């Protein structure tokens, strides 16, 4: 199989439909992970999956797992935790720390992390540009001081939030962050959350599958529409939970 090489001076991607027709979803490989290439990738439903031998591998997945915010489902067991737990959820409180924790997280059936230092640097650049955001869940320690317990990060373009990775240092911490983040993002105008892959974890939150063509069409419409208000840096209330 011939792998498309992405030109360093051109951020355009081949049509993901061809990659999906081959069943592997590999859109192309590049030597760079520039902010401009990342943004163009997300706009087209493509994301960087891993780094191997100096090459970044870019993929599209279809059907695509997404969450429509107004159809968010909070599992009953998590609802109880949300009511009874003394936690705080913030947005953009410690982006670099969240990404570092995601990179260090041990995951089933994975020998290592895909979030190599090059990825961390690239997403930190997107954060500085106002595109990448983190949500953090804080728990009080034995002295009553709140400490980071879990969270996740992703990329926001227009009215789409592209989820990337989660971590939890304490049970349910990343789930709490996510359950609070979705209504918050919806209040600012986010209409679609990209979960990339179909997982049991996201299905518990109400994810659904879109044919890739439908997903790409929604991206074309929603990426061009600005939010009602910038995400900023603040505490996030778990409204309606």
UniProtKB/Swiss-Prot annotation:
Catalysed reaction(s)?
A: N-terminal L-lysyl-[protein] + L-leucyl-tRNA(Leu) = N-terminal L-leucyl-L-lysyl-[protein] + tRNA(Leu) + H(+); N-terminal L-arginyl-[protein] + L-leucyl-tRNA(Leu) = N-terminal L-leucyl-L-arginyl-[protein] + tRNA(Leu) + H(+); L-phenylalanyl-tRNA(Phe) + an N-terminal L-alpha-aminoacyl-[protein] = an N-terminal L-phenylalanyl-L-alpha-aminoacyl-[protein] + tRNA(Phe)
Protein keywords: Acyltransferase, Cytoplasm, Transferase
Q: Which GO terms describe its biological process?
A: protein catabolic process
List the record's Gene Ontology CC terms alphabetically: cytoplasm
Q: Which SUPFAM superfamilies match?
A: Acyl-CoA N-acyltransferases (Nat)
Instruction: Please give the superkingdom of this protein's source.
Output: Bacteria
- Which Enzyme Commission numbers does its entry carry? 2.3.2.6
From the Swiss-Prot or TrEMBL record, what is one GO molecular function term? leucyl-tRNA--protein transferase activity
Q: What class of enzyme is it?
A: transferase
The record's annotation in PANTHER family points to: LEUCYL/PHENYLALANYL-TRNA--PROTEIN TRANSFERASE, LEUCYL_PHENYLALANYL-TRNA--PROTEIN TRANSFERASE
Q: What does this protein do?
A: Functions in the N-end rule pathway of protein degradation where it conjugates Leu, Phe and, less efficiently, Met from aminoacyl-tRNAs to the N-termini of proteins containing an N-terminal arginine or lysine.
Q: Which family does it belong to?
A: Belongs to the L/F-transferase family.
- Its recorded name reads Leucyl/phenylalanyl-tRNA--protein transferase
Q: Which species is listed as the source?
A: Neisseria meningitidis serogroup C / serotype 2a (strain ATCC 700532 / DSM 15464 / FAM18)
